[in-house]
């Protein structure tokens, strides 16, 4: 039954952005559904509405602990739960569904191609487009033209770090370094799900600055897991290390913006934001005719 798959459903508490855009009357409000992991206070709903310049509604469901155990095998075995959660959100009017949690998209998969096929199978059964953070990160690296990412795995334990490293490498990218807090000599949360209760911005900065120094030939830094929030310091991080930084959170939001055709606050996701801005090709032509 659905109650065994979902721990909490927040369908009655939709959040809508209050930003206004010049052509808002002509824009249909998008409704995005988020599937979150159990055991933490997911800030994604608030953050999506904060960065979108277009009207957007966000609905959420949280997977139950018995179907999303914090192990790699537990994450890999969530197909049915994700499908039913996505179908539930679609039935309540969501145009698009995203899985908040990097490992939900890649755990148990050898590379991004396999993960993408799995995601498509789940989406087809649910009857709604679905974005997985684990594939969104790879897609956004592609938009940036990055081929040599360093992987800052923050609080993820060694087996998760190694599996993520292999996944990214097997996708065809030249991983320069993968390290978690322990590898970097950083004292921070190291157990799940407790670690999801948001490592401090200072810890995340230490991890990013440290891996940039240890792997100077990198052309981007990827920060996982989802509890390591980068949105509110992404521009500062990029300024310090001198290269693009993709958080699990910012990569997911970038992918959502592309899929839902959302205009975003300028620079809010760091360097990747400029790749998401629609270009009005009619404006120069109109000027030329004057």
Language model feature labels by segment:
Residues 12-14, 18-84, 165-199:
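N-terminal glycine-rich anion-binding loop in soluble enzyme alpha/beta folds
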Residues 27-34, 56, 125-146, 207-216, ...:
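Hydrophobic structural segments
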Residues 35, 95-101, 150-152, 218-225:
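Periplasmic-binding protein-like
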Residues 37-42, 101-112, 137, 154-160, ...:
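Gly/Ser/Thr-rich loops at beta-strand to alpha-helix junctions
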Residues 81-87, 200-214, 219, 226-232:
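A short, acidic, amphipathic alpha-helical segment used as a generic capping/interface helix at domain edges
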Residues 89, 99, 103-126:
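Glycine/small-residue-rich loop that forms an oxyanion/phosphate-binding "nest" at active or ligand-binding sites
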Residues 121-189:
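Conserved beta-alpha
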Residues 247-290:
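C-terminal functional extensions of proteins
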């Amino acid at each position: 039954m659905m109650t065994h798959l979902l721990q909490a459903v927040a369908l009655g508490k939709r959040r809508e952005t209050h930003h206004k855009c010049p052509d808002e009357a002509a824009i249909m409000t998008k409704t995005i559904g988020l599937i979150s992991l159990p055991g933490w206070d997911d800030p994604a709903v608030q953050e999506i509405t904060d960065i979108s310049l277009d009207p957007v509604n966000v609905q959420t469901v949280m997977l139950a602990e018995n179907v999303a155990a914090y192990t790699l095998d537990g994450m890999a075995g969530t197909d049915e739960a994700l499908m039913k959660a996505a179908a539930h959100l679609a039935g309540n009017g969501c145009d698009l569904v995203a899985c908040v949690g990097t490992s939900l998209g890649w755990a148990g998969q050898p590379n991004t191609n396999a993960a993408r096929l799995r995601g498509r199978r789940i989406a087809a059964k649910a009857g709604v487009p679905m974005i997985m953070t684990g594939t969104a990160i790879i897609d956004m690296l592609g938009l940036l033209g990055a081929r040599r990412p360093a992987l800052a795995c923050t609080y993820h334990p060694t087996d998760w770090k190694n599996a993520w490293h292999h996944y990214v490498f097997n996708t065809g990218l030249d991983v320069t370094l993968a390290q978690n807090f322990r590898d970097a000599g950083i004292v921070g949360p190291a157990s799940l799900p407790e670690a999801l209760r948001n490592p401090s911005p200072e810890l995340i900065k230490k991890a990013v600055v440290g891996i940039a120094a240890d792997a100077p030939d990198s052309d981007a830094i990827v920060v996982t897991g989802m509890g390591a929030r980068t949105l509110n310091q992404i521009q500062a991080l990029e300024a310090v290390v001198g290269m693009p930084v993709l958080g699990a959170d910012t990569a997911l939001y970038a992918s959502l913006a592309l899929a839902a055709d959302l205009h975003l606050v300028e620079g809010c996701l760091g360097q990747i934001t400029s790749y998401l801005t629609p270009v009005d090709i009619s404006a120069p032509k109109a000027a030329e005719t004057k």
